[in-house]
């Protein structure tokens, strides 16, 4: 088998799929920002982490189930592999129901905890209640895509994302600009778009005869635990930019006010797409890594990891250069004020410094959960926001306020990447003994 060709057949569609998932937030920000202004842009920025939780739950469960599916299938245990498909499907149904009820009835409290007040709280509540009602569409829309990739359908996973994305754009234009439905319209467009992605994914899985709810009751708890054990890392990895978003927004309220929040909204929309591109490399190569791991093909596993690191670094450098050259257009894209756009031009280069380091961390994390090294993947997933929070608590009061909030995110990524290199080297050394 040509490993390089197979690698890109899996990874390119995955990268594009993850890029489109990041653009979902940008689409809402674009239409709302140009319709309502800085207040609408700031509202999306504050409220989006709630949407991200729903999508991250789907991604985590989907990845957890699909990793086990690929490993067991490669080891020749097809029957057991299908139980993880069923287990993941039941988990997505359960979490969808719980999240719908929880978010809908506590949306105002959650938004307040995220830093919303006054007009932002009113607009955010309007947005999030609709998102909550469509939780099942978001969970399944993101949760079925990993299964499609592990069934060999990376191209169809990308097509499913494109269909959802195109629907989201068309409906955002219709609901927000033509009908003037503001935050409600943006939220409705988002959940319908995810619903289209879910529908395409379910049809594909049904055609492949890999859509099942059949699992022995006695095996259900153990299967669910194994799915969640693996899925915790991809859940956290997908959510990590939004954890950073919450932390930065909370402290920016004190140091930079609404202008700083709006500035970071513009930056985060763009930089998160880059982070998702890099995660697309890791998660796109995951089916191959899991298959080689399950089949005991160490050489092919190592080659796949090397390709993933190299390709993610190329993407990181190219993305950083392009964004730097176009940074003056970013604030204008979202209808921000001149002051906010000036802030984006000034601050964006700081965040671009972190991109190559994030490439290392995301591929390392994906490699660990693809090969069932769950503890190591947890360390890389959750150490970054902890380090960032500590740095934000320490540095801004002493070394310049808001500017050190920005730099704290970079320092956290550099430290996390360093840890990932150490863990990867040690893990490789252990396997080679």
List PLM regions with ranges:
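Short runs within selected transmembrane alpha-helices of multi-pass transporters and secretion channels
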Residues: 62, 131-149, 157-168, 186-201, ...
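Helix-terminus/linker motif at the lipid-water interface of multi-pass membrane proteins
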Residues: 23-42, 111-118, 174-181, 242-273, ...
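Alpha-helical transmembrane segments and their lipid-water interface positions
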Residues: 17, 21, 25-32, 55-62, ...
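Small-residue-rich hydrophobic transmembrane alpha-helices
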Residues: 41-101, 138-157, 263-321, 325, ...
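Short alpha-helical transmembrane segments in multi-pass integral membrane proteins
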Residues: 1-14, 69-136, 178-232, 289-354, ...
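N-terminal transmembrane alpha-helices
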Residues: 2-36, 49-64, 68, 93-100, ...
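Transmembrane helical elements of multi-pass membrane transporters/channels
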Residues: 9-28, 130, 141, 164, ...
